[in-house]
Regions:
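Substrate-binding strand-loop-helix patch
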Residues: 42-43, 67-76, 96-114, 173
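NAD(P)-dependent short-chain dehydrogenase/reductase
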Residues: 22-76, 83
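Mid/C-terminal beta-alpha module of Rossmann-like enzyme folds, strongest
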Residues: 87-141, 183
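Active-site "gating" loop of Rossmann-like NAD(P)-dependent oxidoreductase/epimerase domains
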Residues: 1-10
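Non-catalytic, hydrophobic alpha-helical segments
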Residues: 77, 81, 95, 107, ...
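Amphipathic terminal alpha-helices
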Residues: 157, 166-183
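Active-site helix of classical SDR
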Residues: 16
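Catalytic tyrosine of NAD(P)H-dependent dehydrogenase/reductases that use a Tyr as the general acid/base
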Residues: 10-13, 40, 66, 93
Length: 183
């Protein structure tokens, strides 16, 4: 639940986010704190752009299959944030696109599947093999990552906000926008 106070950040980054949330909540009476996960959008780096770049340059990829979550498209998120700002339904919220949770491996497979459907055959299974591995098999990363990044969005619905579209739809819209550009 978004209002749960049983926090356990895994790293310094998570700790700093929590301290920021607490500073806002302890200072203001009216605030929105919106927690998101697996964010992708037009600007900056993200997992999708990384997989597309790696997929162009390698014929074999290994991707973790034991970390799960749900993607969040910044375009969809921005529309919701406008709706929230125009309301007085303050508090903590969890937001991701709808469509259920997936692993990073499943997400990669769907990225490539949709890219092929949009005419980019360089991402088909004849050109790229994607192999699932555990986090332990993949090796060390820069920071500890949660195995379960699912967020409970029930408060968002109870407050009357419209849920974000399905993540597969969001991915399709995003890929349509970026695939013919250099990223």
């Amino acid at each position: 639940q978004p209002d749960c106070k049983n926090y356990r950040p895994l790293n310094i980054y998570g700790q700093s986010k929590l301290l920021g949330e607490q500073a806002v909540a302890n200072t203001l009476d009216k605030y929105f704190i919106v927690r998101i996960a697996w964010v992708f959008g037009r600007n900056g780096k993200n997992f999708i752009k990384t997989m597309l770049t790696v997929g162009k340059n390698h014929d074999k990829l290994t991707v973790v299959n034991d970390q799960i979550g749900t993607p969040t498209y910044t375009f969809d998120l921005a529309r919701l944030l406008i709706d929230m700002a125009e309301s007085e339904k303050y508090g903590y919220y969890h937001v991701t696109n709808e469509g259920g949770y997936i692993s990073w491996y499943d997400f990669t497979k769907e990225i490539f599947r949709q890219a092929v459907a949009l005419g980019h055959t360089e991402y088909d299974e004849d050109h790229i093999t994607v192999t699932p591995v555990t986090t332990a098999e993949y090796g060390a990363s820069k920071a500890a990552r949660p195995f379960n990044s699912r967020l409970d969005k029930s408060k968002l619905i109870q407050a009357g906000f419209t849920p974000l579209p399905d993540w597969k739809d969001a991915l399709q819209r995003y890929l349509t926008e970026i695939l013919n550009e250099e990223f």
